[in-house]
Amino acid sequence: MNRIAIVEDDQGYRDTLFTYIKQYEQERDTAFEATPFEKADDFLAVYNGDYDIILMDIEMPGTNGMDAAEQIRKKDAQVVIMFITNMAHYAIKGYE
């Protein structure tokens, strides 16, 4: 089973992402274990390389998603990180 971390400070967006994941599971007859985190700091405190995919908001209180991703990459070069944002100016930076 693939493990997904949803790191998003907005409850509404977290709920939407869970809905999309459940829909994908049904359409593809697969299963994911999705775990929500409200802050990047909370996620970083427990992350030890045990997620396959990280859905990461960029604008959050405390450590932002870009800085969190840099810290994650120091521990885990293989995990898939997908940034979630509605701010276009972050689009290019997310690929660095």
State where each predicted segment sits.
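Non-catalytic signal-transmission and effector/linker regions of two-component phosphorelay proteins
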Residues: 1-3
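Conserved acidic carboxylate
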Residues: 8
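Short, glycine/serine-rich, charged loops/turns that create anion-binding
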Residues: 11, 41, 88
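Two-component/phosphorelay signaling modules centered on CheY-like receiver
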Residues: 11-35
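Short, hydrophobic beta-strand segments that form beta-sheet elements in well-ordered domains
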Residues: 35-37, 83-84
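Helix N-cap/capping motif at the beta->alpha junctions
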Residues: 36-42, 65
